[in-house]
Amino acid sequence: MSDLLSRTHAIALDAADPLRPLRNEFLIPRHGGGEQTYFVGNSLGLQPRGAQAAVQEVMKQWGELAVEGHFTGPTQWLSYHRLVSAQLARVVGALPSEVVAMNTLSVNLHLMMVSFYRPTAQRPVILMEAGAFPTDRHAVEAQIRFHGFDPAECLVEVQPDEANGTISLTAIERAIAEHGPRLALVLWPGVQYRTGQAFDLDAITRAARLQGARIGFDLAHSVGNLPLRLHDVAPDFAVWCHYKYLNSGPGAVAGAFVHERHHRDTTLPRFAGWWGHEEATRFQMAPQFTPAIGAEGWQLSNPPILGLAPLRASLDLFERAGMEALRSKSLALTGMLEALVRARLSGVLDIITPAEPQRRGCQLSLRVIGGRERGRALFEHLRGIGVLGDWREPDVIRISPTPLYNRYLDVHHFVEEVEAWAGL
């Protein structure tokens, strides 16, 4: 085995890692007498140490100011959601006016489709990937039915055409072109949740717009994982959650993007609520709705301040690190994991995530050779010894080395434990 795949080399890489201090900014779950080896940042990110202080700041302000906290104090709640806008915009490559933290992903997806899925008899079709995360498919079917159409006729799913269940860009572009005259909306993920495949958002956007279709992205597994350029790529909308790579806690407030070309479009339908009304006249309580300019205009209710506080703490860490530095470390971490699996576990694990670094984020999806029961046995064994990935039916273990807090030694430890389990 190459020295570059040795435990000694992993320790040396950790010692030289410029992002190493950021691990200390997180609470690492305990296991036995030590720390858990945690590879589930793609499902629920670890708690930033600053999250509790951020929440306590809000609690203190509530206790001391009560309702006046909306308008006074160091972080008045009237504009609290804007405290995250600039940092969040840098994470997703957008203008601050194009992003808003609000609701949850499924709610935001429905709100965006109210505005950007406008089917007609000639253009009723939504195109998405086969095997999409269930909430996306549920929402799409519900929207199609809401407009009086039949999902059996108006939902097109692009099937995998590559080994291991991934989808080529050629297949996506071909499907968009084939259904183009009937396409109302293309809804696509930035990263496919089960396979870990990352997609070329530029190319998909171009293909959709060439056919006159709207384009939106579910970036649940992309935000905080991959550098994004939403303003330049210019989809109509995007939605995502903040509890994965953005480390904002279970059920965290989610995020949405609306490109600036739509900000002053008064013909665009939307579901309205009072917090989406322009701030200057909101408290005049007029019956007419005047939307705020920007993504803020899609807000409904006043934001949950206690839910936004942990997001502030996490975004501060992203500011310290920078997305390019995080991506650089992520490539190295996941590259080491791939190399070790291929060198030492080729008879135990199959990697179903694309091998090309530009076609994946930090996640590797692994299928245990020997079938589902053997795979589940390995997953439970690893969990029992404090090495935590996650399981996705029917037979995939997802391992996601997250550069904010995972180490090269964590990757090496995972491979050693699988070797021991397999008796290698």
Curated annotation (Swiss-Prot):
Cellular component terms per the entry's GO annotation: cytoplasm
Major enzyme class: hydrolase
GO biological process: anthranilate metabolic process; L-kynurenine catabolic process; L-tryptophan catabolic process to kynurenine; NAD biosynthetic process; quinolinate biosynthetic process
Needed co-factor(s): pyridoxal 5'-phosphate
Pfam families in UniProt: KYNU_C
Catalysis: reaction(s): L-kynurenine + H2O = anthranilate + L-alanine + H(+); 3-hydroxy-L-kynurenine + H2O = 3-hydroxyanthranilate + L-alanine + H(+)
Biological pathway: Amino-acid degradation; L-kynurenine degradation; L-alanine and anthranilate from L-kynurenine: step 1/1; Cofactor biosynthesis; NAD(+) biosynthesis; quinolinate from L-kynurenine: step 2/3
Residues with N6-(pyridoxal phosphate)lysine modification: 244
EC code: 3.7.1.3
Amino-acid positions noted as binding pyridoxal 5'-phosphate in the UniProt annotation, renumbered to this chain: 105-106, 133-136, 218, 221, 243, 274, 302
UniProt GO molecular function: kynureninase activity; pyridoxal phosphate binding
Keywords attached to this entry: Hydrolase, Pyridine nucleotide biosynthesis, Pyridoxal phosphate
Function (record text): Catalyzes the cleavage of L-kynurenine (L-Kyn) and L-3-hydroxykynurenine (L-3OHKyn) into anthranilic acid (AA) and 3-hydroxyanthranilic acid (3-OHAA), respectively.
Family membership: Belongs to the kynureninase family.
Record's subunit section: Homodimer.
Protein name (database record): Kynureninase
Annotated organism of origin: Stenotrophomonas maltophilia (strain K279a)
Name of encoding gene: kynU
